[in-house]
Regions:
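Alpha-helical transmembrane segments in inner-membrane proteins
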Residues: 1-254
Length: 254
């Protein structure tokens, strides 16, 4: 039986309340400020069509995706910190975000502005980068310090590659890529949430299923192995989940 502390329950409730309050504020705010009662009426469909569209088609996707992206990045960071046990063990420092950005640039240069291609390319770029770092760091097992150092080196090479792609791209593509790289939820609609949002939800479920392995790995490799955990396979699986979460979030918001 899993014991859940009162402190954890209270913390989760407070975070849930904060998310609801932030969501309502996000639905109210914009070029046209709405009252809270108007927001709830629009969600129920009891307002004029124009107001309902503003709330449900424009603001609601951005609010929900902001919460989903925050959850993805938070869980991804927690997984990396658990695996690396080092403040430098984060997706941005190790180059996985940069790998996703490389995938986006390649998609923009080769496939134009197709949103589905860009989203998939971001995830492929992040996954390929993580596998490359993992393979380069493998020496009869993975040492986290070596993994971080190699990740920093791969990130530096990808930054140079991305700069070269931007220099070779057309002016329009370079400007679009620069705006995308800045990161924004502006213009995000329901149609643009696929395939990234479903993938994030699936990876969050996968992360929840891997919590037991993660806790055992935190006790040390020998202890985890004695308790029946395949250490290297579990590490690779958790890292892939964390990378996909980061890449999918990057595909949504830049």
């Amino acid at each position: 039986m899993i014991y859940v502390s009162r402190r954890l329950i209270i913390t989760c409730l407070l975070l849930l309340i904060a998310c609801v309050m932030a969501g309502v504020w996000g639905l109210r705010s914009g070029a046209v400020t709405l009252e809270t009662s108007q927001v709830f009426a629009a969600l129920m469909g009891d307002t004029p069509r124009s107001m309902t569209m503003v709330v449900t088609e424009w603001r609601l996707p951005r609010v929900l995706m902001a919460l989903l992206i925050g959850a993805a990045l938070g869980v991804s960071g927690a997984i990396f910190q658990s695996l690396m046990r080092n403040p430098l063990g984060s997706p941005d420092v190790m180059g996985f975000n940069t790998g996703a950005w490389s995938g986006v640039l390649v998609a923009m240069v080769l496939f134009g502005q197709d949103l589905t291609a860009i989203a998939l390319a971001a995830m492929v770029g992040g996954i390929v980068t993580s596998l490359l770092v993992w393979l380069l760091a493998w020496r009869n097992g993975i040492d986290t310090f070596r993994l971080i150092i190699i990740g920093i080196g791969v990130r530096a090479m990808l930054v140079a590659f991305n700069t070269w792609l931007l220099l070779k791209a057309s002016l329009e593509t370079a400007l679009t890529a620069g705006l995308w790289n800045a990161g924004s939820l502006n213009g995000l609609t329901w149609a643009k949430t696929s395939p990234s949002a479903p993938i994030i939800i699936l990876m969050l479920i996968a992360a929840a299923l891997l919590v037991r392995r993660m806790r055992l790995l935190e006790m040390g490799d020998d202890t985890a192995c004695a308790l029946g955990v395949s250490v290297e396979r579990s590490r690779l699986l958790m890292m892939l989940v964390a990378v996909v979460l980061t890449a999918a979030a990057t595909a949504l918001a830049g």
